[in-house]
């Protein structure tokens, strides 16, 4: 198996300027099979008919469904679509990737974090940006250095991770331990995430496999 065999679906804003689309774009650029789902051109994203999305067909046979938590702030329809995609995707055997970043209005972090917590058991890879780590640290009243480990232990998420471009360092908390890896290249956080999820399906789930995926 190689990256060209990895299938990734992302859902997000039709303007294609959100984190889900960025991950999608990075995955596509390194050779994964990708598809982006959004509303029709003549629809408003906030109110589009999300029932028209055939999630069973769209998620059948894929490895990952990528969402950005900020999407739920864009209207009732996007929020419902995120939830439906996760539910049907899980039934079809897809694994969920959730990106958490600080919204344009920082006060909304509590809203998106509440949504993530409500869906935490459906998420397989939870990626938290450096900015969001600080915000969640304040919300949860725990040290920044403990956020990833605490969230993984509370929610039993298989992979909780972050990447610092300045430090060129990836941090991953997983079911049997934790890994801190320095990358040779100075890359963007979502590019690191894309490389990680593209390698993870065939790198293995143990420490060696996860470290290998971290350095993809």
Name these PLM-found stretches.
Residues 1-216:
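Ribokinase/PfkB-type carbohydrate-kinase core domain
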């Amino acid at each position: 198996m190689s990256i060209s065999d990895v299938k990734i679906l992302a859902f997000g804003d039709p303007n294609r300027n959100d984190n889900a689309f960025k991950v999608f774009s990075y995955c596509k650029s390194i050779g994964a099979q990708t598809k982006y789902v959004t509303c029709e051109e003549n629809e408003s994203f906030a109110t589009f008919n999300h029932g028209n999305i055939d999630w069973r067909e769209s998620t059948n046979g894929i490895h990952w469904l990528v969402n950005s938590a900020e999407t739920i702030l864009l209207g009732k329809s996007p929020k419902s679509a995120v939830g439906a995609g996760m539910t049907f995707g899980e039934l079809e055997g897809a694994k969920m990737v959730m990106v958490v970043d600080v919204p344009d209005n920082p006060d909304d972090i509590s809203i998106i974090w509440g949504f993530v917590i409500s869906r935490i058991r459906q998420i397989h890879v939870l990626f938290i940006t450096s900015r969001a780590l600080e915000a969640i640290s304040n919300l949860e009243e725990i040290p920044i250095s403990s956020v990833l480990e605490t969230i993984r232990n509370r929610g039993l998420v298989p992979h909780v991770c972050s990447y610092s471009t300045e430090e060129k360092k990836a941090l991953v908390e997983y079911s049997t331990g934790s890994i801190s890896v320095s990358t040779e290249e100075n890359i963007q956080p979502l590019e690191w995430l894309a490389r990680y999820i593209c390698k993870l399906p065939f790198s293995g789930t143990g420490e060696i496999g996860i470290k290998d995926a971290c350095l993809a």
